[in-house]
């Protein structure tokens, strides 16, 4: 019979091979897991397999390219085994972009509050994502961290060691940044806003992007004669 798990394996291998085409493979993220069906027993031929796929990239343009290429990989996998394919796409977070001028304001304030040896200035972009990425696609942002030397966040052992530093001093940092931005009739804030080139010029453009990548597509189907019908981009 038609084995959808085999089709999924072909598709996942094809998508994995896309990493070799990326000029920024260290920040490209593709991950996939079979989350449903795929065979109830070793000797069963699975008629339905569900794969959950996630993508990350440093820019929206790269993310769109990856989405297109990964769709093609799964279309190829389905076609190779003669099975149908439905692709359900939902948008996650936009890649995070940071405003260098806003970073410098944060650093200037930090130098008044923290010892020099405890301040790290890096412009390296992280592939980590959160809703700050969506905000940064429209307005200047900074995603700074204030730590107290305790266990790393996102770990079981994470806890606060220095409550004053993490509460009061961190609050002083944020207020200090606001004072710098809003002083002199918000001159610095206006300068940063004018220099920033957002991913989306308008909120409407951002919403259109979100809508474009929220869809369900019957990417591979067959007519009554068994002729394949491709509906992917």
Summary of predicted features, one role per range:
Residues 20-24, 81-85, 116-118, 181-190:
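Surface-exposed helix-capping loop/turn segments at secondary-structure junctions
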Residues 120-177, 181-233:
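Zn-dependent metallopeptidase/amidohydrolase metal-coordination segment
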Residues 1-104, 108-110, 124-133:
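Midchain, well-structured core segments that form catalytic/ion-binding scaffolds
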């Amino acid at each position: 019979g038609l084995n959808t798990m085999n089709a999924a394996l072909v598709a996942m291998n094809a998508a994995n091979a896309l990493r070799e085409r990326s000029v920024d493979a260290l920040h490209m993220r593709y991950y996939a897991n079979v989350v449903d069906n795929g065979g109830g027993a070793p000797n069963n031929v699975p008629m339905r397999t569900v794969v959950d796929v996630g993508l990350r990239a440093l820019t929206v343009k790269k993310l769109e390219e990856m989405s297109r290429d990964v769709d093609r990989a799964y279309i190829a996998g389905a076609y190779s085994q003669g099975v149908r394919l439905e692709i359900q796409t939902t948008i996650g977070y936009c890649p995070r972009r940071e405003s260098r001028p806003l970073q410098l304001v944060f650093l200037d304030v930090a130098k008044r509050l923290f010892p020099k040896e405890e301040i790290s200035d890096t412009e390296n972009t992280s592939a980590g994502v959160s809703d700050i990425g969506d905000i940064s696609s429209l307005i200047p942002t900074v995603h700074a961290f204030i730590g107290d030397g305790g266990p790393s966040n996102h770990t079981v052992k994470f806890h606060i060691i220095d409550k004053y530093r993490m509460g009061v001093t961190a609050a002083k940092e944020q207020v200090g940044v606001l004072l710098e931005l809003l002083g002199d009739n918000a001159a610095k804030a206006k300068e940063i806003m004018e220099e920033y080139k957002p991913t989306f010029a308008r909120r409407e453009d951002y919403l259109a992007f979100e809508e474009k990548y929220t869809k369900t597509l019957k990417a591979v189907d067959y007519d009554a004669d068994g002729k394949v019908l491709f509906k992917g981009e």
